Amino acid sequence: MIKVGLIGGGGIASAHIKGYRGHADKIGITAVADAVEETAKARGEELGATPYTDYREMLANEDLDAVDICLPHHLHRDAIVAAAEAGRHILCEKPLCLTADEAADVRAAVTEHGVTLMCAHNQLFMPTVAKAKELIEAGTIGTVYEVRTTDSFYNDFDPSSMGWRASSKTSGGGELIDTGYHPTYLMLHLAGGLPVEATAMLSTHRLKFMEGEDSAQVLIKFDNGVVGQLVTSWAYEPAASTERFSAVGELGSLHSDGTSLSYRLRSGETETFELESVDTFVAEIGHFAESLRTKSRPIHTEEEGIAVLGILLAAYEGSRSKTIAPVLKV
């Protein structure tokens, strides 16, 4: 049994907990830390785990194999470094961290202490994403020219419920580095190259109380020639015909609404795959457990997390300076 310490017992932790329950024969939470004592106690009772209000104390006292970081964005770097220094493997919620300096600290800590870090990029475990990656790597649509990703919904946050997400200092920006992080790592996964430059147009259509944007449209260039287009928003639902993701190549294209996947080739060949949906958090936790058990590389490590952060920072800089900004190399 892989023993995990949960760091942060807030909302997203519930999705992770469901994942652990789905793999209770392999991995489980034995300790939980949250700065709010009532939350720590409640999660501890829920999980039969030892509660702490300080994750550093938990790391010092508990016999743990790994930690699962479910903290507000601005607290990720410190928790990652502390866990790595304690020799614990790490599953970290999005985003990995917020700045290039923080990314350098994360990479250095993970490398120095020889621990595994997996980014909690749960949408990679959608069956349609796995099938699209398989088709692209098999050359079904030929050399890829363009990838598009979308993740938009009508968010009913208000100032009383927005919490730390309303502040750029604690969130790292606005919607783009939050929900927009999902279509960014999906873009990276499907494009198959390293990001080299990006720009964005940011908007605040509806959630005016936020310091950051509530919507973003991003362009990304990769070193293999792929150009990515990304749309994400908390202000509105996408149009009914909008694909979740698509890719266009020299031989044809593929697209998906998230539950089915179709490709159409210039030769006239077409095929549609109807794929059974899965709980992506359950699949994510299972993958983390298997990676630790077999000592194999997770689907996305700190390297992909840093690449995603590089895209986002370049997009923010491109928007600020009204230029196409280079993706920083960390």
Can you name each region flagged by the protein language model?
Residues 184-260, 285-296:
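Contiguous beta-strand/loop segments that form the cofactor/metal-binding neighborhood of enzyme cores
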